[in-house]
């Protein structure tokens, strides 16, 4: 089928000459080059591979079981997230089956103080489900045309996480942190433009509800003439997180003077911020500064509590990638044995509670505690480092004091 061109044979599929390829395989009146063979082989392998289901078939208890391996505490939030994610991907899996009923998307809002595990929950979910995951900071977002990131940049991050596989990205998870920082400045509409508050909420509305967005693959503002990638956000799960400092006061004010039983309950637990946040209603979020349309598109709301000493201690030792296991492995790389006694770990947890930084503060304390040993591992006697409570107190005290001279 392929004739000699000036005495040279060519591939019957791609048309490349014999001199342009590494190998040309001859058949009855046809030829195929090594490049086309490799391409065909890849196609056959991909088609023969069983469809990757990821975690789509996991039931809520199974999802929570995996979350338990990485996230300590926050039992109610893990249960809420497991059900929300299960329902979301069940909806996707049966999208071609159910025609008479259209099931809406259930985006999620996580309310909790810094270091309570909001980001870790979202990241672990993406790992469980084996779907592309992107994380964004709401404080960097502005309306289109202003200095800052466009909303489309979040979708670009998801595309990058999916290696620009649009179909995979359209089933991914986007976590937007610090969403409480884009609350509008007051409940009343302002005559001035709020480009980083209400303006961002307005820009996010269509994206989180479901629309076809034009995403610039190289970023929107520096390359205005590039080709855009169309991405449908109907099936992207959005998870929002924020500390919402001051929300508990709004909840208390709403319930002051209402039902005696509820008010008594609120007063009883007034010192436990997490318990108060359990009573969050959409109207409280609107009062805080989220616009009603935005709140309406996030039907699943759950709160995470501030972590106590016992939970922080468990975080140090129990997760698959706990800090104790991480630092033990780091020291093993220098042929050193690292040991902590329980009193030392409890002291570290106590310091984290005092700093009010939650689980995020544990690493900073551990870094400070082990700094000298990591700086000069050869100075460790007998190839062993044993950390006790007295060492924790001494090191943290010296770090908190000004050096003289």
UniProtKB/Swiss-Prot annotation:
GO cellular component, one term: HslUV protease complex
Pfam families assigned: AAA_2, ClpB_D2-small, zf-C4_ClpX
Chain residues that bind ATP: 113-120
Example GO molecular function: ATP hydrolysis activity
Ranges for domain ClpX-type ZB: 1-52
Record key words, sorted: ATP-binding, Chaperone, Metal-binding, Nucleotide-binding, Zinc
Keyword Aminoacyl-tRNA synthetase among UniProt keywords: no
One BP term from GO: proteolysis involved in protein catabolic process
Annotated binding of Zn(2+), by residue: 11, 14, 33, 36
Complex formation: Component of the ClpX-ClpP complex. Forms a hexameric ring that, in the presence of ATP, binds to fourteen ClpP subunits assembled into a disk-like structure with a central cavity, resembling the structure of eukaryotic proteasomes.
Alphabetical list of HAMAP family matching this protein: ClpX
Entry-linked PANTHER family: ATP-DEPENDENT CLP PROTEASE ATP-BINDING SUBUNIT CLPX-LIKE, MITOCHONDRIAL (PTHR48102:SF7), ATP-DEPENDENT CLP PROTEASE ATP-BINDING SUBUNIT CLPX-LIKE, MITOCHONDRIAL-RELATED (PTHR48102)
The protein's name: ATP-dependent Clp protease ATP-binding subunit ClpX
The organism's taxonomic lineage, starting at the top: Bacteria, Pseudomonadati, Pseudomonadota, Alphaproteobacteria, Rickettsiales
């Amino acid at each position: 089928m392929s004739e000699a061109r000036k005495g040279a044979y060519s591939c019957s599929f791609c048309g490349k000459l014999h001199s342009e390829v590494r190998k040309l395989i001859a058949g009855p009146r046809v030829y195929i080059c090594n490049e086309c063979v490799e391409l065909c082989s890849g196609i056959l392998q991909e088609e023969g591979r069983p469809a990757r289901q990821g975690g789509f078939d996991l039931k809520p208890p199974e999802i929570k079981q995996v979350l338990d391996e990485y996230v300590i505490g926050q039992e109610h939030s893990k249960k809420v997230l497991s059900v929300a994610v299960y329902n979301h991907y069940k909806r996707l899996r049966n999208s071609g089956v159910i025609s008479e009923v259209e099931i809406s998307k259930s985006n999620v809002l996580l309310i909790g103080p810094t270091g309570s595990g909001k980001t870790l929950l979202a990241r672990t979910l993406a790992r469980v489900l084996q779907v592309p995951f992107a994380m964004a900071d709401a404080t960097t977002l502005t309306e289109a045309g202003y200095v800052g990131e466009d909303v489309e940049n979040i979708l670009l991050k998801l595309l990058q996480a999916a290696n620009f596989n649009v179909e995979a990205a359209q089933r991914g998870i986007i976590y937007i942190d610090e969403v409480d920082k884009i609350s509008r400045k007051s409940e009343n509409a302002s005559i001035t433009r709020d480009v980083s508050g209400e303006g961002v909420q307005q820009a996010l509305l269509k994206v989180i509800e479901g629309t076809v967005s034009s995403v610039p693959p190289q970023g929107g503002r520096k390359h205005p003439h590039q080709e855009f990638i169309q991405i449908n956000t109907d099936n992207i799960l959005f998870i929002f997180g924020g500390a919402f400092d001051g929300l508990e006061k709004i909840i208390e004010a709403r319930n002051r003077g209402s039902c005696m039983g509820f008010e008594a309950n609120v007063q009883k637990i007034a010192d436990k911020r997490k318990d108060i946040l359990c009573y969050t209603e959409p109207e409280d979020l609107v009062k805080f500064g989220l616009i009603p349309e935005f709140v309406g598109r996030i039907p699943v709301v759950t709160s995470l509590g501030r972590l106590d000493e016992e939970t922080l201690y468990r975080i140090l030792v129990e997760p698959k990638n706990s800090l104790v296991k991480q630092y033990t492995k780091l020291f093993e790389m220098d042929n050193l044995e690292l040991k902590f006694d329980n009193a030392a770990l409890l002291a570290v947890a106590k310091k984290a509670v005092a700093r009010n930084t939650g689980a995020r503060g544990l690493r900073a304390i551990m870094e400070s505690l082990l700094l000298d040993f990591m700086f000069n591992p050869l100075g460790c006697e007998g190839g062993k480092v044993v950390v006790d409570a007295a060492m924790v107190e001494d090191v943290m005290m010296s770090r908190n004091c000004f050096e003289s001279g």
